């Protein structure tokens, strides 16, 4: 339980995405590929067929693990709860690695990130990216915002890294009003256009061709936790060296099941 709590603290995606539990095998998630429409029909007229078409997204499981060895003396003499610290440290390690994969993972031996060319978010800027390779304008953030369909904007938020935050905090509209609005309540995120802003070190910096800001409803990113997450203490394996090992393992996958629900801003190449 301590490991799970630490993971949620360290990985922002676990707070924003849809987290499910799976037992075995791949999980098939049905997704609407195209939607039908209604039609105006004459009295006694034939109602035209207009079916939705469906596709599937398959979510599996990839193994993520970490280990640490501690001397028996340190474990016995420690003035604080060392096992509690180790659980939190494992949460930091695994949580950071998860977050990295959920953003830039290529789907090979790890989850598929929202920035991956295949199965990732859609481009919310022009085909050539922003007007500059080294900056972002007020209008480009506005374009990104409105590139996302209205139903998704209701639960949408921005994610970027700290250096991009620094640049965007300086943007003003034509009347001198800042685009960025700081939070007035402790524990709640700042906002852009009334949408929360979160930061991640794994979002690329502002540079030519980089995807630097992502905006969308991340509940359409599904994280599948395979049952069997473990946190083990190994008393015997390193006994000859006077050490105790601690191992944490988990199996997890993540995929964006509806790409149109998340958009990214890309710098000019």
Put a short name on every predicted segment.
Residues 43-48, 82-85, 174-175, 212-214, ...:
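Short intrinsically disordered coil segments
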Residues 153-163:
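C-terminal amphipathic alpha-helical segment
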Residues 191-236:
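C-terminal hydrophobic structural anchor segments
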Residues 168, 206-208, 222-224, 240, ...:
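Short active-site-adjacent structural elements
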Residues 154, 193, 227, 242-244:
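A short pocket-lining beta-strand/turn micro-motif at the edge of beta-sheets
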Residues 235-269:
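Extended, compositionally biased alpha-helical segments that mediate assembly or anchoring
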Residues 1-155, 169, 177-180, 184-191, ...:
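Acidic/polar, low-complexity extended loops/arms that serve as protein-protein interfaces
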Residues 161, 197, 246:
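Hydrophobic, well-ordered secondary-structure elements that form the walls
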């Amino acid at each position: 339980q301590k490991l799970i709590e630490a993971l949620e603290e360290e990985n922002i995606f676990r707070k924003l995405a849809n987290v499910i539990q799976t037992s075995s095998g791949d999980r098939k998630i049905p997704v609407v590929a195209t939607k039908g429409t209604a039609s105006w029909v004459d009295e006694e007229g034939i109602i035209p067929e207009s079916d939705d078409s469906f596709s599937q997204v398959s979510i599996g499981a990839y193994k993520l693990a970490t280990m640490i060895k501690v001397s028996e003396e340190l474990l016995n003499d420690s003035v604080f709860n060392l096992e509690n610290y180790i659980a939190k440290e494992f949460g930091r390690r695994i949580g950071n690695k998860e977050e990295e994969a959920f953003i830039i993972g290529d789907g090979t031996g790890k989850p598929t990130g929202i920035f991956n060319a295949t199965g990732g978010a859609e481009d919310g800027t022009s085909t050539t990216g922003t007007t500059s390779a080294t900056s972002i304008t007020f209008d480009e953030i506005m374009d990104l915002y409105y590139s996302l369909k209205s139903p998704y904007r209701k639960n949408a938020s921005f994610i970027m890294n700290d250096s991009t935050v620094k640049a965007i905090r300086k943007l003003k509209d034509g009347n001198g009003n800042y685009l960025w609005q700081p939070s007035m309540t402790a524990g709640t995120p700042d906002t852009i256009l009334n949408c929360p802003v979160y930061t991640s070190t794994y979002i690329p910096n502002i540079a030519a061709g980089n995807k630097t800001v992502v905006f969308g409803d991340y509940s359409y990113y599904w994280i599948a936790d395979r049952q069997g997450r473990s946190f083990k203490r190994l008393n015997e394996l390193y006994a000859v060296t006077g050490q105790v090992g601690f191992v944490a393992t988990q199996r997890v996958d993540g995929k964006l099941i509806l790409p149109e629900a998340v958009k990214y801003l890309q710098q000019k190449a």
